[in-house]
Amino acid sequence: LLAKALCLAMHLLGLHKEMDDMDTCIRWFQRFIWIGIAMNMVFAIPALFAPGLLTSVVGLPPQLSDPWLENAGMLLVGISVFYMPSGFNAPRYVVHSWLCVLTRLIAVVFWIYLINTSIQGSVFVPMLMGDLSFFLILGILLYLGTTPQNRPWALLCDGWREWRAAWKRQWQSHGFKVGTLVVLAVLGFIGYETWYQMLRVVPEQEYASDEDHYKYAAIGLGIEARIPYYLFAVLPQMCPEKMPKPGGWEVFGFLYENGKDLPIGMAKRQIGYPTVEPNCALCHTGSYRASASDVAVNVPSAPANTLQLQAFQWYAYDCASDPKFTTDAVMAAINSKFQLGFFEKLYNRYLIIPMAKSALLKQKQAYAWQKLRPQQGPGRTDTFNPTKMVVFGFPDDSTIGTVDLPQVWNQKPRESMYLHWDGNNNKIHERNYAAAMAVGATPESVLPPSFNRVTNWLLGHKAPAWPWALDQAKVAQGKPIWEANCAACHDFGRADTGQVTTHIDQLGTDPHRLDSFTTGLVAAFHTFKKPPFDFGAYRKTQSYSNTPTDGVWLRAPYLHNGSVPTLWDLLQPPEKRPVVFITGSDVYDPVNVGFVTTGAQAKASADFNYDTRLEGNHNTGHLYGTQLSDDDKRALIEFMKTL
């Protein structure tokens, strides 16, 4: 039927007279081979020499420009060279010609796989249609242009008979038998070692307590989002001049517990080789202490107020880009710290470390947009621009989505509330899976049992109580002030809590985060349905949500972008709020309720200057309570310590 359809098409094109003999089919086969080569080169040359331009012209996601396009370009050049003998003389190289047809079929299968597994699957549909068309045209022309004995089934049967006969002759030789067994043994050993070093799935560590599981268990990120464990251990010493100050990962605000080799929020996972990956606790475990000389108290599910996530990312990216970041240098550092076996060293040297470097360089390009925005600083991240540009492949729209990292405790009463700062979703599982996807989880990699255990623990895990003494008289004075000025929007059980009720023009807070979550992103979420990921509850809003305030004392700095350092500052008119202040300290200010931002204590424990004059950092709006007297403000703050 396909052959008849092609003949009909040729007839309609006025070429039916040329279809009278097989030579004509072969000539057209060779012409289409050269057409295919030309089309390959039209794609391959810019892919090799101008990948960024190609992505913008074709509409591919920008993160595919490197190294994906360069690799694709080299592959297409190789395939084009492979096609050339058939383009010159297909009858002479008939088996080779059928292999050319087969490559198109392999490409069709590859595109179908990408379309069904990749988040950007739709962009590969034109490639699928192109290769499918060439497969059908080339296959039909070659079939019509060859004799029956040169068609696939006959060639396969002849080849099988010849192979069996040759095998029987060779098998008579004792040396051939020994050589065959040696080759099979070597191949088997290489295959086993490759499986053992690269693919073997080691069961995840079981944690007795839900809290330890939250802090140290993997949730299932994709391979490019995981860092080889040995590399993670030595990376701080690879480029010490690029570190903010001497030390290990703690200089980026990572929190450690005694006896643990990994910081809280970094999970060890082994698929072949050991890796580490971030989990929920990295961004949602905070700390506090009374003075810079005290030992910090770690609080799982609190905002990670000291974590400098962007600085950590770019240290890894810039270090991987450094000329001295070579496999030899990395392996020397690893060997000085760990005792690896012979084959473990071999696979790390020639596969694992080069793969990790390639992944870091790819991420560096994918996250280059971060350099065009104000620095995030401690305790903050851009929530949805990574999803927009890195996951879904949207072009950079210059929006700023930087927010203060939120707490994640006490999720049960929040299950149906519209949260994510702008109230864009009221489904806890969707919110959690979307956060995981933004840092590298995929439908194939995510571990639902581990994820569900974390989610279930957070449902009932309560906010920490105020750890210091309270002035009960002030608490009593502050309660009615809270009821009159704050409770309607921020108390559990109220109709407006967890809802978007006040337009951004009236609320007056910085609109950049709101603008960064677009209707296009909502549409992308709604169409992305690959179990267990399903994001049908996302919506676009026109302001920020009224969030519950349990544990508000440990959620400083305040407002969605962390632009107001303390509750006392939040109750001041915007013109009296600090313009520039230090963030990243976990030394607590129990009077003003927040972390210290000035003075020796702040400078001893942090060094990032938050500038509210920068776009996305504005400290305007939320004027509620600013009209109160200072005495009433102090009473209100004392009561809010009890929430």
Task: Describe each model-derived feature in a short phrase.
Residues 26-33, 39-67:
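Membrane-helix boundary elements
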Residues 38-46, 64-88, 101-105:
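Core segments of alpha-helical transmembrane spans in multipass integral membrane proteins
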Residues 83-95, 115:
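Juxtamembrane helix-break-helix junctions at the cytosolic face
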Residues 97-111:
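Hydrophobic alpha-helical membrane segments
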Residues 109-126:
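Membrane-helix boundary connector in multi-pass membrane proteins
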Residues 132-154:
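Membrane-water interface at the C-terminal end of transmembrane alpha helices
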Residues 151-172:
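Membrane-interfacial, low-structure loops and terminal tails that flank and connect transmembrane helices
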Residues 173-643:
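Periplasmic c-type cytochrome electron-transfer domains
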